[in-house]
């Protein structure tokens, strides 16, 4: 069975701004008109569903982007998203695969820096892309045991990027051109595996393992500015204490970061020149070690 769809969206966004703290004289009155079409095909053949789609998406910059780009006003970003894949289902297992190519024009990417309140700053890059494959496997060994495994492999690149370094010797900025570099804070490999044990209708126990590959703190693909890869294990249990027609009580217990791994999933970097020497400062947001969480959820219907 072959089916198709077409989705047409038109958006109008108006920006009005009467300056802000660092640039009180910046007066903005801009209107963005976006046409976002999407179309796709799918074909159902017994246990397999094939699909393909293409979509255009436009997105306006946000207030933080204006504050980060005092000299040059940020542009809207445009995306053409191509996707294709399949879903294969059987009573005891299922396999999904999805290929994608996201072609950006003027993508607003993280710069690796933060503003005066600690929020990440973004800038437009003329040409960039994100491409990859997503795979997911679900398998039920029996009524009590099941597992889900997913993996994402991607390449996230900026075709051309200019890095600006503050030079305190000359009171100016040094521009460094980079070609075909990785987009900041974009891991190339991420995996997730969940093992579920359900001994009865009241109790479910989940063991989740997540892996994130190394990431770059900024868009220079500099090996001295990275976030290390990490592997996490979490265990959580859900126990349904009471399940009535109008009243449900659920007890949940979580053990996060079971192996007490020291890791930082986010951070920022800043480089400057002083006394003819370049200094780079990498800063990290470390997460908690092993931690516990107990909750009681009550639903009234």
What positions do the PLM features span?
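C-terminal beta-signal and adjacent terminal beta-strands/loops
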Residues: 103-105, 147, 155-157, 213-216, ...
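Outer-membrane beta-barrel channels and translocator barrels
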Residues: 1-3, 44-48, 89-93, 130, ...
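Transmembrane beta-strands of outer-membrane beta-barrel proteins
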Residues: 4-8, 37, 50-52, 95-97, ...
């Amino acid at each position: 069975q072959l089916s198709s769809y077409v989705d047409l969206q038109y958006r109008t966004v108006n920006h009005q701004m009467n300056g802000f703290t660092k640039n009180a004289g910046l007066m903005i009155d801009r209107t963005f008109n976006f046409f976002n079409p999407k179309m796709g095909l799918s074909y159902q053949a017994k246990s397999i569903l094939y699909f393909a789609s293409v979509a255009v998406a436009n997105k306006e910059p946000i207030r933080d982007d204006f504050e980060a780009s005092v000299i040059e006003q940020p542009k809207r970003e445009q995306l053409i998203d191509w996707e294709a894949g399949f879903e294969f289902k059987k009573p005891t297992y299922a396999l999904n695969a999805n290929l994608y190519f996201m072609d950006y024009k003027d993508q607003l990417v993280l710069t690796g820096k933060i503003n005066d309140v600690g929020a990440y700053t973004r800038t437009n890059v003329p040409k960039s892309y994100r491409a990859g494959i997503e795979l997911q496997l679900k398998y039920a060994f029996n009524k009590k045991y099941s597992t889900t495994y997913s993996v994402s492999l991607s390449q996230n690149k900026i075709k051309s990027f200019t890095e600006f370094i503050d030079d305190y010797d000359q009171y100016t900025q040094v521009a460094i051109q980079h070609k075909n570099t990785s987009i900041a804070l974009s891991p190339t490999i991420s995996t997730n595996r969940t093992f579920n044990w359900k001994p009865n209708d009241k109790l479910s126990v989940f063991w989740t393992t997540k892996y994130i590959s190394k990431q770059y703190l900024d868009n220079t693909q500099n090996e001295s500015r990275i976030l290390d890869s990490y592997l996490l294990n979490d265990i959580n249990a859900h126990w349904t204490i009471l399940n009535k027609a109008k009243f449900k009580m659920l007890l949940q217990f979580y053990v996060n970061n079971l192996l007490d791994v020291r890791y930082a999933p986010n951070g920022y970097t800043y480089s400057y020149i002083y006394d003819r020497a370049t200094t780079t400062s990498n800063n990290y947001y470390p997460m908690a070690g092993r931690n516990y969480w107990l909750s009681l959820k009550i639903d009234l219907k």
